[in-house]
Amino acid sequence: MARTKPDPATTPTSTGPASEASAIPLHGTVETPPATEPGPRVVDPSVPVGEPPVGPTEPLVPASEPLTPASAPSPRKDAPRTMRDLRLATEARRRSTTPRAADNPLREGLRLERVPDPHIFVLFGATGDLAHRKVVPALHQLWRTHLLPHEFTLVCVGRRPYTDEAFRDELKASLAKFSRSQPIDREAWDDMASRITYHRGDFNDPAAYAALADHLDTIDLAHGTRGNRLFYLATQPSAFPEIIAQLGHAGLDHEHHDGGWRRVVIEKPFGRDLESAIRLNREVGKVFRERQVYRIDHYLGKETVRNLLVFRFANGIFEPIWNRRHIDHVQITVAESLGIEGRGAFYEETGASRDFLQNHLLQLLSLVAMEPPATFEADALRDEKVKVIRAIAEMTPAQVRRDVVRGQYGPGWVSGKPVVGYRQEPHVDPESETETFIAARLMIDDWRWSGIPFYLRMGKRLPKRATEIAIQFKEVPHQLFRDSAADPEPNLLAMRIQPDEGIMLRFGAKVPGLGVDVRNVTMDFTYGSAFQTDSPDAYETLILDALLGDASLFTRADEVEEAWSIVDPIIAAWAEEGSPDFPSYEAGTWGPAVADDLLAREGRRWRRI
């Protein structure tokens, strides 16, 4: 029976009064806008994604010049003046620069025409690891592929003292390490860097937010960003409530009557249990409406995950067999060869259950198991995902002991190199009981999936990095070729999320010859070979969606709470069990041996990835 759950948190909407504190001096300067009149960017649909527009953009004036629209440079005389000029010049450029691979008909449909409104992107936690590794590289990639408007401006908020120029140098060094486009396009970076300012302030200081509000108003006037602002919280989760409240007190949540929007992106983890998630949802709801809130889970931005819905609902051959009558079980694996990468303090507070099960794994499960939404709108999609999570059977302590396995890695070898155990990692308790591996058998109580187990596993320091969804179909009712088949196995559909994103279908086929010899063969699709283009990074996809106001791939308040109501009983049952026997698996292996028993007792086994 599906579990019962407390009433969801109410999310009243209110906006706190603007701060009475006097504004402190602005920390940062703003350059003038491009030469063209403010307005939406023109994107020629004949140009593939990543193809630069015709004609170089004018550099912005130095930061030392007055911040007035009058200081903008005049338009280039040789720039295209009509859409016809633009199309002719673009076509000539394409013929000279586009490889023949672009003629692949599968590339049709890859061309994006949507560009966000002019806006200011406000990045909290700009000096942190997430901002440097993921957020800024994603913004740079969107900029260099012309998917951000000319009026785009990035305001980086942090507590450390930086000048604009010094912080730009820091970001440039990070791009050299973490950008997926190497070497860095110097012209594109210089153009983007001129739109970056640094704003210093403590997250709990009202005066810093008042100064930030003035800073953003100045940019609005100079760059024509129309009051559109996206606040990205790339900070420690403990800072979320304070930042949200201060944004409300400073009036930064107010949307303009003339259409200017305000949105906030909140990173995971969203709470550390059901109670804290409900409390955080309430705090967010006091300032922002639900339609303004984008709770990000980067796994939902991965290409194969996004393709899962297309695969299911745009092809007539799969959905009729996507049910308990044809599917034997489902496996979802998230394997990481890395350890905790210096994040000992963070992982001691989360563990695999909070870090992966509550979000990534349950999100993947819900996309596999959901019913077709009535439309492809955000709320219709999320309604169906919530129904799936609500239908997952709640576990008693006895069921947790039977159907959930936790583990922690000890010393071992990964990729031919010795590695330390979790308890030897920096900032980790030498007697830590934090799990770095979790495997679970979950059941969904609904008409489509009743009786079909979903096996989920995630682990650190496993032999390889791989994420996969495997749909194991049932055997044929009568095996005609059992005697001739070398290794008769049921059909399997595997969706590789990382690396080498793609889809594989396994089926039996006759070996050429005079006899009837059956072997397993595969049909394999990979994005790189089919479309001859790199898939975008998940953060590029999700940031662009947030800027466009598309919440389809972001989690809703009730969705987060339902997921925590699955994980909380597991953590509570572990607390009653006492100390686990850790470490329970060597680094470089596939986890504790007892995890195999989850499947073996029912005559199944984990798929070899």
Tell what function each PLM region has.
Residues 6-69, 74-81:
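N-terminal intrinsically disordered, low-complexity tails
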